[in-house]
């Protein structure tokens, strides 16, 4: 049996976009990165409330960047790039008959979509490939064009400093308090997301839950990634609403060979793509959480539930001293 690696999850919400333009082929991920082994160090980290961070949170636009179109992508020189898609988090496309990828997307232009569906010009300012087990995580600095024609960073960290993003296929429903829809991952083949560093979507990829990768059992980690975005935000009800505050400690583990449990903390709950399958009274909410119509599975925390739909189990130090 392969030894599991444990991490305690953290998410401070921020969003980023990016894509670049030099000429560099993405490295083929090693088997080690493909099965997402040992991707995160052991340690206690912090959670956060936002799914994709401070995305265009300004008075000029008054809306959020919810997705980015693959169609009509253009190179830095303005030429249309055809067949643009993501291989992992690296862009691939064609400039005529020439295949372009990796840093060749520096300066590329994309069309983003705001919450009301209106378009927003985006520009990839820089592209950088990750290293080691994260060599398949490409980082992008992305700007949007304001009404005055100037370019501003799409993503900012908690201190307001510009930050980068990871590109990931599909889009999310950012609404909160919407049963059955809020917080959902939408597998839209025409769109992708620029996931800002520090927010749940990007954070969960750094934990090893890369949607394009597979676990030690050979199964896709896409479901684990989505479950992680729910868990990090304490979206117990699966309606997109967070039941925590930034800076709460949380530990998570799985049976996929990505994160293992070494903490002796209190059980919080079990998670799948739709939210919590069950949870205890000792949660990061520090108050009672009620989900209308929710029926918890029995024997919460039983690790045999990993065989019947549970993706992750979370623990909190609620009531534990010495932290």
Describe the residue ranges of each PLM region.
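Bacterial N-terminal signal peptides that target proteins for export
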Residues: 1-8
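Structured alpha-helical
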Residues: 12
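C-terminal motif of bacterial Sec signal peptides marking the signal peptidase cleavage site
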Residues: 15-18
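Repetitive, compositionally biased segments used for assembly/scaffolding
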Residues: 23-323
């Amino acid at each position: 049996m392969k030894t599991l690696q444990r991490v305690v999850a953290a998410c401070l919400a921020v969003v980023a976009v990016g894509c670049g333009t030099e000429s560099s082929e993405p490295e083929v991920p090693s088997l080690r990165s493909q099965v997402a082994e040992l991707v995160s160090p052991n340690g206690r980290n912090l959670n956060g409330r936002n799914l994709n961070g401070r995305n265009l949170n300004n008075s000029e636009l008054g809306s959020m960047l919810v997705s980015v179109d693959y169609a009509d992508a253009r190179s830095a020189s303005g030429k249309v790039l055809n067949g643009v898609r993501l291989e992992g988090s690296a862009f691939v496309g064609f400039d005529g008959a020439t295949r372009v990828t990796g840093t060749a997307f520096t300066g590329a232009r994309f069309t983003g979509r705001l919450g009301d569906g209106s378009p927003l010009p985006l520009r990839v300012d820089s592209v950088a490939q990750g290293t080691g087990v994260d060599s398949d995580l490409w980082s992008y600095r992305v700007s949007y064009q304001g009404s005055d024609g100037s370019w501003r960073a799409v993503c900012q960290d908690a201190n307001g400093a510009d930050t980068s993003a990871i590109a990931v296929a599909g889009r999310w429903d950012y609404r909160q308090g919407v049963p059955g829809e809020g917080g959902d991952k939408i597998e839209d083949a025409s769109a992708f997301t620029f996931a800002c560093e520090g927010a749940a979507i990007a954070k969960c990829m750094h934990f090893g839950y890369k949607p394009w990768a597979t676990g030690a059992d050979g199964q896709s980690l896409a479901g684990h990634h989505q479950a992680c975005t729910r868990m990090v935000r304490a979206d117990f009800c699966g309606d997109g609403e967070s039941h925590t505050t930034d800076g709460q400690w949380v530990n998570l583990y799985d049976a996929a060979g990505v994160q293992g449990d070494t903490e002796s903390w209190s059980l919080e709950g079990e998670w799948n793509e739709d939210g919590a399958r069950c949870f205890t009274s000792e949660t990061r909410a520090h108050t009672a959480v009620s989900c209308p119509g929710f029926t918890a599975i029995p024997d919460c925390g039983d690790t045999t539930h990993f065989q019947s739909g549970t993706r992750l189990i979370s623990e909190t130090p609620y009531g534990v001293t010495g932290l």
